[in-house]
A protein has these predicted regions:
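Alpha-helical scaffolding within the catalytic cores
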Residues: 1, 32-33, 59-72, 92-103, ...
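Serine-esterase "nucleophile elbow" of acetyl-processing enzymes
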Residues: 1-55, 65-74, 274-282, 287-292, ...
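Structural recognition of the beta-strand scaffold that forms the well-ordered cores
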Residues: 10-14, 19, 48-53, 77-82, ...
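Cell-envelope and extracellular/periplasmic
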Residues: 17, 51-62, 73, 77-88, ...
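Extracytoplasmic/secreted cell-surface and envelope-processing proteins
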Residues: 22-23, 59-60, 86-97, 122-127, ...
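Active-site segments of SGNH/GDSL-like serine hydrolases
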Residues: 81, 85, 101-139
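Catalytic His-Asp segment of secreted/periplasmic serine-dependent ester chemistry enzymes
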Residues: 123-224
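Conserved catalytic region of serine esterases and O-acyltransferases that act on ester linkages
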Residues: 187-350
């Protein structure tokens, strides 16, 4: 164990806005930073904590940014948080989440802890009657992968509701809104993780240190996302372009995308070689215009709406643009006004 030997360790928080620190009043109040501080206090070592949380992103986005936001930092421990943002009941998230776990475990020097958060329905800051109901998260879709790879799971959300249902606390005691923990909630989540780590440390002499062999097959049988990556404005050059320029869209932590600032709209076309799927197109708040996505001359999406009231979103294309063999694709994006698009998610043959 590197920390016990006095070596510097690196921890990556990988997830959505909770990991990013929403509703925590300072970085040292975020659950990931508190876990990092536990290592500093326990082992008196240097700890690098890398916050790779991005608000409103899912494991589908995560698997496309894993190289840049996880592996580039050579982590010793990754705290994985996507169980809130992956839509409850949407089975499409099973495969990207499994691939996140599997890709990290393939780096045999890296450990994982899956952290489970959640939200409430009918939120009320004043706890009025018939408010703050427990909402579903995607634990039921993620749990088979967690168990299959024997990943430690800290179910903060499930444990929290046992206290709420017993009348010990209210949702608003530990949350800053309908979904994000307050400083108190971040501390509780970190304390649960640190309790697990303390138990591991206390029983370290009895733990088999042999790195387990990954199962040969994926649990859900779909390895399409194993090669997932983002292609951004610095990676590919359009073959035709009208009114789009390369640029960061609202400062989000992803690669540069392309922005159209012309009120009459524009179009941009890319040729991408030998892909097995065009996984998604990211879009971000730049205006109220509508865009269309066309792949190999066929309309895939005709009404991509970049809503000015949101920070952005993404369009899932795997179901519509997926190939049995590596295929060259021509991708065109058209819009009728100001619009911003993020990097293009693709997968390649292994």
């Amino acid at each position: 164990m590197k920390a016990k030997r006095g070596e510097t360790i690196t921890i990556v928080g990988f997830g959505g806005s909770i990991t990013e620190g929403a509703k925590a009043t300072s970085s040292d109040k975020q659950y990931g930073e508190i876990v990092a501080q536990w290592f500093r206090d326990t082992f008196d070592v240097n700890v690098n904590y890398v916050n790779s949380g991005i608000g409103s992103t899912t494991s589908l986005v995560g698997i496309h940014r894993i190289e840049e936001h996880v592996f580039a930092h050579n982590p010793d421990l990754v705290l994985v948080d996507f169980t809130t943002n992956d839509s409850a009941g949407d089975e499409r998230y099973r495969s990207p989440y499994e691939t996140v776990l599997r890709r990290i475990l393939e780096d045999t020097d890296t450990a994982i802890i899956s952290v489970v958060f959640g939200a409430v329905s009918n939120y009320s800051a004043d706890n009025v009657a018939n408010s703050n109901y427990r909402a579903n998260n995607s634990l039921s879709a993620h749990l088979p992968s967690m168990l299959y790879y024997d990943v430690p799971v800290i179910d903060y959300y499930g444990s929290l509701w046992r206290y709420i249902n017993a009348g010990v606390i209210k949702w608003t005691d530990v949350a800053g809104d309908y979904i994000h923990p307050s400083n108190t909630g971040h501390l509780m989540a970190a304390s649960a993780i640190n309790c697990y780590l303390s138990d591991v440390l206390a029983n370290l002499d009895d733990i088999d240190t042999t790195v387990p062999t990954l199962p040969e097959d994926y649990f859900f049988g779909d390895d399409i996302y194993e090669t997932a990556t983002f292609l951004g404005g610095d990676d590919i050059v359009p073959v035709s372009n009208s009114n789009f320029t390369v640029g960061k869209v609202h400062g989000i932590k992803l690669k540069k995308g392309w922005v159209c600032t012309n009120n009459t709209g524009g179009s941009i076309t890319f040729e991408i070689k030998a892909v097995t799927s065009l996984t998604l197109y990211l879009q971000y708040k730049e205006g109220n215009s509508v865009g269309g996505i066309y792949v190999n001359g066929k309309t895939v999406i005709s009404n991509a709406n970049c809503n000015n009231s949101s920070t952005g979103g993404y369009i899932w294309l795997t179901d519509q643009v997926r190939f049995d063999e590596p295929t060259d694709v021509t991708v065109t994006f058209k819009c009728n006004g100001v619009f911003g698009i993020g990097p293009i998610g693709v997968t390649y043959a292994k």
